[in-house]
Amino acid sequence: MRSPTVTTKLQQIAEQAARDPDRVFWTLAHLIDEDFLREAYRHTSKSSAAGVDGVTAQQYAEHLDDNLRDLHERLRSGRYQAAPVERVWIEKEDGRQRPIGKPTFEDKIVQRAVAMLLEAIYEQDFYDGSYGFRQGRSPHDALHELRERCMMEGIGWIVDADISGYFDSLDRPHLREVLRKRVNDGGLWRLIGKWLRAGVMEKGVLSHPETGVVQGGVISPVLANIFLHHVLDAWFEREVTPRMRGRCFLIRFADDFVIGCELEADARKIMAVLPKRFARFGLTIHPTKTALVAFRKPDGHTPSDMGNGTFDFLGFTHYWTKSRQGFWVIKRRTARKRLRRTKQALWRWCRTNRHAPLKDQYHMLSLKLRGHFQYYGIRGNVRRLEVVSRYAEKAWRYWLSRRSSKSAIRWEKFQQLLETYALPIPRIVHNI
C-alpha cells in the first residue's frame, strides 16, 4: 500500500487529469520529496543487477534514510546527475541480439518517482485496447479481448503489424512534443533529458545515442507507451475508426499490436495509411513483417476442420478450428518461433549447467518449466506444453549423460531419477 500522503497526491493529479483531458500540468517536480522517493523506492525492483556504479539494492538499503535524504537534496538543488546505463545483450526469437540497459539503482528510484506522476495523468487518457506496461492489464487480458472481439464482431481481416526497432528509433524531439501536450514541467523535463543524454556504457566504452530510449530503464516503457498512445491509439480512435464502413478495433501490448477489421476494404485502407502515419513521427513499419491476414470465420461448407488464415500475437498463433461440439472457434497455440526459442534455451541451459549438483539443476529447470507453463498454459495449448515438457527431459538426460565418459544414462535409469526429481507437468493456467 502507498503512504497516505503520496496516495493523496497521485489521486488529486489523476482526478484533475480525468476532469480535464486538455489540461497541461506545469508543476509536478516539487511533489517529489523524501516521502515520495521512499514510496518510489518501495515500488522499485530489488532483484535486478547493479548498474555502472556497482551499488546493489541491498547495499543502498543499508543507509536508506541517508541515501534518500541526500538524493532529495541533489534533486532539489539541481545537482542530481544521471549515470550511464550499462548495456547487456539478450537473444531475440529470430536469433538477433536485443540491447538491454541497466540503470543504477538510485536512477531507478528517481525514474520510478517520475513514472508514478506520469502514470497518474496518462492512465486517464489511455484507451481500453492498450495493455502493455499498465498495472492490472496482463498479456492474457489482451489475448482474451482479442479472441472475444474477433469472434463476436464478425472480424474477417487482421492487420498484423511490426514496428522496426521501436525503442531504439523513438524520435526524442517528437517525444518531447507529444509529452508537452499534457506535461510541461521544466523540472521533470530536465530529469528526463538527463536520462536520455546519460549515455550507454558497453565494455568500458561510453556512447551517446541520439535517438531512442534505453530498454531496461524504469521510465523507458512509460515514455514509449505515452508516445504510441499519441502516434497510434488516439489517432486510430479519433481519425481512423470514424472513417471505416465496418467494425474495427486495435489491441496493443507495448510496441506489439494488431488491428481487426470486419471489411477487407477497411483493412486495406489502414494498411496503406499506417506506414505514412508512423513515418511522420520518425518510426518505420517493417515492410516484410507486416501483413494483411484473411481471418474470417469459416462457413459451414469449409471441408477442413482448420481455417486458413493465422497470425501471431504475444507469442501465440491464433487460428480458427472446430470445437469438440462442431462449432467454429478461435484457439491459440505457442507460436513456432517461440517454441523453437524455448527449446534452444533449454538445450543451452542443460549443456552449460550439466556439472552443477543434480538438486540445483532440478530446482532451476523446474523454475523454468513452471514459468513457461504459467505464461503459455492457456486453454487449447496443452499439446505445445507437452512438447516443451518432453524436450526438457530429453535435453536434461542428454547433457547429464555427457558429464563424463562414464556417466551415460539409459532411459530406464533416467525414469528412476525422475521419480525423485519429478519435473513439473504441463497444466492449463488460463481459461481464456
Each language-model region and where it sits:
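Non-catalytic terminal/accessory segments
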Residues: M1-I432
